[in-house]
């Protein structure tokens, strides 16, 4: 399989250094001479309002205990879910809390092929980043026969993978947090991405792919360092997302104080879950008996 990223990232191609440094992908973002979002990614990434459909009009019927607690307003925020490390299995939970502020953007759509006896089977792989630009970011990857189906699936997976982003200060703690709290490193394949705190006003000094993820995470100032085969956009984005998700994986002196945990929502609202539980009956059809002579 020949990846189209190599063709787009050459010195003379649309992703070359002479055309704004698009980072080797055709349908994403950047400030090249050919405009914004040429190729397969054209017209996408404008937020939830640009991709309306019948799915949003349907009433959400939760199928998990967490979904029932969220819909019944027993859980007030996403942070309560993250505090107890409860797995989120329904994308509607994210829409319930962050729906109005969520923005998504297609990073890349690439064809992948599988050799079969009938020939080559081509499918499309979509990379989608999603975030609210205020401390929550997610990354989804989906492969499907059709581009639209791959994008929809990647958006759902990105919502399910949303993580909280911890932000901090470079020097004096004045104003709102604006950068990563300390140096963090993420890895995927051969790609290693390091995020380094930066002074206020520096901006995000990075390639286009990490820059988009950091912006969606709500980080305003950050230095980055990357090594490995960063032309592989999927690994580059996953390594950046891994680094961002590690901002809450270590303790700092302000977190040394003993934390008094309350009961898990499943324990606290056990009676409510029992009352609202509806048993789903599955009708099993028995195959007709075959008469033998």
Swiss-Prot record:
Region of interest called 2 X 4 AA tandem repeats of R-G-G-F, as start-end residue ranges on this chain: 22-29
Post-translational modification: Citrullinated by PADI4 in the Arg/Gly-rich region. Asymmetric arginine dimethylation by PRMT3 occurs at multiple sites in the Arg/Gly-rich region.
A matching Pfam family: Ribosomal_S5_C
Main location (coarse class): cytoplasm
Residues the record lists as N6-acetyllysine modifications: 263, 275
InterPro entries: Ribosomal_Su5_D2-typ_SF, Ribosomal_uS5, Ribosomal_uS5_C, Ribosomal_uS5_euk/arc, Ribosomal_uS5_N, Ribosomal_uS5_N_CS, Ribsml_uS5_D2-typ_fold_subgr
Region (3 X 3 AA tandem repeats of G-G-P) residue spans: 9-17
Record-listed Phosphoserine modification sites: 264, 281
Lineage top rank: taxon: Eukaryota
Record has Phosphoprotein as a keyword: yes
Crosslink position(s): Glycyl lysine isopeptide (Lys-Gly) (interchain with G-Cter in SUMO1): 275
Task performed by this protein: Component of the ribosome, a large ribonucleoprotein complex responsible for the synthesis of proteins in the cell. The small ribosomal subunit (SSU) binds messenger RNAs (mRNAs) and translates the encoded message by selecting cognate aminoacyl-transfer RNA (tRNA) molecules. The large subunit (LSU) contains the ribosomal catalytic site termed the peptidyl transferase center (PTC), which catalyzes the formation of peptide bonds, thereby polymerizing the amino acids delivered by tRNAs into a polypeptide chain.
Protein name: Small ribosomal subunit protein uS5
Taxonomic source organism: Rattus norvegicus (Rat)
Taxonomic placement: Eukaryota, Metazoa, Chordata, Craniata, Vertebrata
Gene coding for it: Rps2
């Amino acid at each position: 399989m020949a990846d189209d990223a190599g063709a787009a990232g050459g010195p003379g191609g649309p992703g070359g250094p002479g055309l704004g440094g698009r980072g080797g992908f055709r349908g994403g973002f950047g400030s090249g001479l050919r405009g914004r979002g040429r190729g397969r990614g054209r017209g996408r990434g404008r937020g939830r309002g640009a991709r309306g459909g019948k799915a949003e009009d349907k009433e959400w019927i939760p199928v998990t205990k967490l979904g029932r607690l969220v819909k019944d307003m027993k859980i007030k925020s996403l942070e309560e879910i993250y505090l107890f490390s409860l797995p989120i299995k329904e994308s509607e939970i994210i829409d319930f809390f962050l729906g109005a502020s969520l923005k998504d953007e297609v990073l890349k759509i690439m064809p992948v092929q599988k050799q079969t006896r009938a020939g080559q089977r081509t499918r499309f792989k979509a990379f989608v980043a999603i975030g609210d630009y205020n401390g929550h970011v997610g990354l989804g990857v989906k492969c499907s026969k059709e581009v639209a189906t791959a994008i929809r699936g990647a958006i759902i997976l990105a919502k399910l993978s949303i993580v909280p982003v911890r932000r901090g200060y470079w020097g004096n703690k004045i104003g709102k947090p604006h950068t990563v709290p300390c140096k963090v490193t993420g890895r995927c394949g051969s790609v290693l991405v390091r995020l380094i705190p930066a002074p206020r006003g520096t901006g995000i000094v990075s390639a286009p792919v990490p820059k988009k993820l950091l912006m969606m995470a709500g980080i305003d100032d950050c230095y980055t360092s990357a090594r490995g085969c960063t032309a592989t956009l999927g690994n580059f984005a996953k390594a950046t997302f891994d680094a961002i998700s590690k901002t809450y994986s270590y303790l700092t002196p302000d977190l040394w104080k003993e934390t008094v945990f309350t009961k898990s929502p499943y324990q606290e609202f056990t009676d409510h879950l029992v009352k609202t539980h509806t048993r789903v009956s599955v009708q099993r059809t028995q195959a007709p008996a075959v008469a033998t002579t």
